[in-house]
Swiss-Prot record:
It comes from Pisum sativum. GO terms for cellular component: cytosol. This is Bifunctional UDP-glucose 4-epimerase and UDP-xylose 4-epimerase 1. Signal peptide: none annotated. Substrate binds at residue 133.
Length: 350
């Protein structure tokens, strides 16, 4: 535990990665204020964070219901509290939905973030950890993905992340006192070991592990495997899956870097394990962890899906002193622990 009186604003802190990061911030002695509009999350998630950290630490957590697109919500928050840094998670993140409704994504992800920068600058809070994504690499020409690769998003969601990275670089270049870390996540999975926090998507899940989990608890009949003829070891696509608690610790490491490195500028880091697992390998690992058989439906490839993507983690290891600790076995164990305790997510009912 590191004592700290620093206060961190966490936008979208009621979401999957947000809640797990807030737990680690509180455990590391930070004071935390969450702002969230519950577009893709619920108040119960915030209550569970309080439960997980205990009554003492939960005194250091505040919550505000607000929307970054409404500048007044931010203005009230920054007028009331002095923030030392912002961790910015808030945003929509479903690739398919972004293709069908790009305007919603541009409004939510871009407008909200631009408002946030303006209010931060006005109140002289110029340190940010930004939640980016490996989607900014698009179809990488080679692997592993290294931070200085050419960036080329393939869909509106990915483009919002890419635009926001470019905006961050432009702001920092024009106003060098800003310190910004861009964290490019690969595929976050798993859950808090308590089984009280986890991913709870609305509707049909867009990501592999919540989908597998819903088949395991009987909410969905089978898993659609998109592509079984890729040139990989078992024909299914390969991705870099990372435990959400490793990801949360990556944010703590990034925050420490912001506070200690005057010359950080605007720097990007990959957060992954540096190892790829195929869809079918993840299914097998989950079956082993849960004792459940996952019914599969083999489907054609989805347009735009890459064959194999995984991270080079050398830069984060060297500059942030961070390295993923958990393997696929722990990811599936914790995912199943969350699923069996919360088959219907935070609502507890169909």
């Amino acid at each position: 535990m590191v004592a700290s009186s620093q206060k961190i604003l966490v936008t979208g802190g009621a979401g999957f990665i947000g809640t797990h990061t807030v737990v680690q911030l509180l455990n590391n002695g930070f004071n935390v204020s969450i702002i969230d509009n519950f577009d893709n999350s619920v108040m119960e998630a915030v209550e569970r964070v309080r439960e997980v950290v205990g009554s003492n630490l939960s005194q250091n957590l505040e919550f505000t219901l607000g929307d970054l697109r409404n500048k007044d919500d931010l203005e009230k928050l920054f007028s009331k509290s002095k923030f030392d840094a912002v961790i910015h998670f808030a945003g929509l993140k479903a690739v398919g939905e972004s293709v069908e409704n790009p305007r919603r994504y541009f409004d939510n992800n871009l407008v909200g973030t631009i408002n946030l920068y303006e209010v931060m600058a006005k109140h002289n809070c110029k340190k940010m950890v930004f939640s980016s994504s490996a989607t900014v690499y698009g179809q990488p020409e080679k692997i592993p993905c290294v931070e200085d690769f050419k960036l080329q998003a393939m869909n509106p969601y990915g483009r919002t992340k890419l635009f926001l990275e470019e905006i961050a670089r432009d702001i920092q270049k024009a106003e060098p006192e800003w310190r910004i870390v861009l964290l490019r996540y690969f595929n976050p999975v798993g859950a808090h070991e308590s089984g009280k926090l986890g991913e709870d998507p609305r509707g049909i899940p867009n990501n592999l592990m919540p989908y597998i989990q819903q088949v395991a608890v009987g909410r969905l009949p089978e898993l659609n495997v998109y592509g079984h003829d890729y040139p990989t070891r078992d024909g299914s696509a390969i991705r870099d899956y990372i435990h959400v608690m490793d990801l949360a610790d990556g944010h703590i490491a990034a925050l420490r870097k912001l506070f200690t490195s005057e010359n950080i500028g605007c720097t990007a880091y990959n957060l992954g394990t540096g190892r790829g697992s195929s869809v079918l390998e993840m299914v097998a690992a989950f079956e082993k962890a849960s004792g459940k058989k996952i019914a599969l439906k083999l489907c054609p490839r989805r347009p735009g899906d890459a064959t194999e993507v995984y991270a080079s983690t050398a830069k984060a290891e060297k500059e942030l002193g961070w390295k993923a600790k958990y393997g696929v076995e722990e990811m599936c164990r914790d995912q199943w622990n969350w699923a069996k305790n919360n088959p219907w997510g935070y609502s507890g009912k169909p």
